Swiss-Prot record:
<comment type="subunit">
    <text>NDH is composed of at least 16 different subunits, 5 of which are encoded in the nucleus.</text>
</comment>
<dbReference type="InterPro" id="IPR022885">
    <property type="entry name" value="NDH1_su_D/H"/>
</dbReference>
<comment type="similarity">
    <text>Belongs to the complex I 49 kDa subunit family.</text>
</comment>
<keyword id="KW-0793">Thylakoid</keyword>
<keyword id="KW-1278">Translocase</keyword>
<dbReference type="GO" id="GO:0009535">
    <property type="term" value="C:chloroplast thylakoid membrane"/>
</dbReference>
<keyword id="KW-0934">Plastid</keyword>
<dbReference type="InterPro" id="IPR014029">
    <property type="entry name" value="NADH_UbQ_OxRdtase_49kDa_CS"/>
</dbReference>
<keyword id="KW-0520">NAD</keyword>
<comment type="function">
    <text>NDH shuttles electrons from NAD(P)H:plastoquinone, via FMN and iron-sulfur (Fe-S) centers, to quinones in the photosynthetic chain and possibly in a chloroplast respiratory chain. The immediate electron acceptor for the enzyme in this species is believed to be plastoquinone. Couples the redox reaction to proton translocation, and thus conserves the redox energy in a proton gradient.</text>
</comment>
<keyword id="KW-0150">Chloroplast</keyword>
<keyword id="KW-0813">Transport</keyword>
<dbReference type="GO" id="GO:0016655">
    <property type="term" value="F:oxidoreductase activity, acting on NAD(P)H, quinone or similar compound as acceptor"/>
</dbReference>
<keyword id="KW-0618">Plastoquinone</keyword>
<dbReference type="GO" id="GO:0019684">
    <property type="term" value="P:photosynthesis, light reaction"/>
</dbReference>
<dbReference type="InterPro" id="IPR029014">
    <property type="entry name" value="NiFe-Hase_large"/>
</dbReference>
<dbReference type="GO" id="GO:0048038">
    <property type="term" value="F:quinone binding"/>
</dbReference>
Length: 393
């Protein structure tokens, strides 16, 4: 009787691409020795739609509906960066009330994004129950979005110089009720997840990134803060009105998948704290800067003179971008979302470069999964939190 021969050659496995509603159309070519990962090559581009080139053939107003398709789970941030770029370029001031409304919407969107990270991440680890729990709170956030913007997703709410509409009557009370309810929900998540020995076994020490590595790879967001680097653009750049609220940067020093989970859970608590303070301090006044609603053909134009044309209802579609360049960034749920904008005295941007956080954070994946087990790939990929819409653009 001859003994069965054992093969020593490596095995190549294709993981993905999956449907965009799941982890997105990401393909991983994984080289395995048994269950040990020898190499991993991400294949990108399945969801590429030419978002940068579209921007260079549209006015900013025309382009606004497109941007919600980058990160379609945190659409307020893509809208914010799209209007912030021309606002900084032309030095447009926004009313204080509009700034507070923006902060409230951004933090609600951050919570919604982190919730839809938490559910699938736990499902990847084999815990299906939290996936159903997170939709409870997420639907309440979408109810708030629908009441304020008319849309549950793809809100199209931000405008150059402010927001599209003021908060409706009774919205603030509903938002405060949600904040009180959600804090109890976070405690429930922690009781359900954090003490689970199977969960801890799957995430502790898995996907370790040191602080130096995180900086060298250009990581941002929870990926960076989980490695001991206290860097949050809301504190660094002081955009909108974040400097008027009392909150702390959430960080961990361990640098593994568990640390990234803890950072995101803590960030949701801080977001609630910011929302409550913003609602308490929100001033009256206009929700949009009427100065944006005019053509400014001459830099020295004065009120009501011949050069000063006032438009009635909407910002001018002929909003010209002056000949200069700048880089603007916001702290999105996944990291630093930036726009490099070059204007040339025309209606369209000459260059519109998107700096997506997911694309940069994904680059470290092959290094993290090497010498790990095959089952750890989904743990590490889930802890990075990517949306292929913004990765491929």
């Amino acid at each position: 009787m001859s003994l069965p021969l054992t093969r020593k050659d490596l095995m190549i496995v294709n993981m993905g691409p999956q449907h965009p509603s799941m982890h997105g159309v990401l393909r991983l070519i994984v080289t395995l020795d048994g269950e040990d990962v020898i190499d991993c090559e991400p294949i990108l581009g399945y969801l590429h739609r030419g978002m940068e080139k579209i921007a260079e053939n549209r006015t900013i107003i025309q382009y606004l509906p497109y941007v919600t398709r980058w990160d379609y789970l945190a659409t307020m941030f893509t809208e914010a960066i799209t209007v912030n770029a021309p606002e900084f370029l032309e030095n447009i001031q926004i009313p204080q009330r509009a700034s507070y409304i923006r902060v409230i919407m951004l933090e609600l969107s951050r919570i919604a994004s982190h919730l839809l990270w938490l559910g699938p991440f736990m499902a990847d680890l084999g815990a299906q129950t939290p996936f159903f729990y997170i939709f409870r709170e997420r639907e309440l956030i979408y109810d708030l979005f629908e009441a304020a913007t008319g849309m549950r997703m793809m809100h199209n709410y931000f405008r150059i110089g402010g927001v599209a509409a003021d908060l409706p009557y009774g919205w603030i009370d509903k938002c405060l009720d949600f904040c009180d309810y959600f804090l109890r929900g976070i405690i429930e998540y922690q009781q359900l997840i954090k003490q689970n020995p199977i969960f801890l076994e799957r995430v502790e020490g898995v996907g370790f990134i040191s602080g130096e590595e995180a900086v060298n790879w250009g990581l941002s967001g929870p990926m960076l803060r989980a490695s001991g680097i206290q860097w949050d653009l809301r504190k660094v750049d002081l955009y909108e009105s974040y400097n008027q609220f009392d909150w702390k940067v959430q960080w961990q020093k361990e640098g593994d998948s568990l640390a990234r989970y803890l950072v995101r859970i803590s960030e949701m608590r801080e977001s609630i704290k910011i929302i409550q303070q913003a609602i308490e301090k929100i001033p009256g006044g206009p929700y949009e800067n009427l100065e944006v609603r005019r053509f400014k053909k001459a830099k020295t134009s004065e009120w009501n003179d011949f050069e000063y044309k006032f438009l009635g209802k909407k910002p001018s579609p002929n909003f010209e971008l002056s000949k200069q360049e700048l880089y603007v960034r916001v702290e999105a749920p996944k990291g630093e979302l930036g726009i490099y904008l070059v204007g040339d005295d025309s209606l369209f941007p000459w260059r519109w470069k998107i700096r997506p956080p997911g694309f940069i954070n994904l680059q470290i994946l092959p290094q993290l999964v090497k010498k790990m087990k095959l089952a750890d790939i989904m743990t590490i990929l889930g802890s990075i939190d990517i949306i292929m819409g913004e990765v491929d653009r």
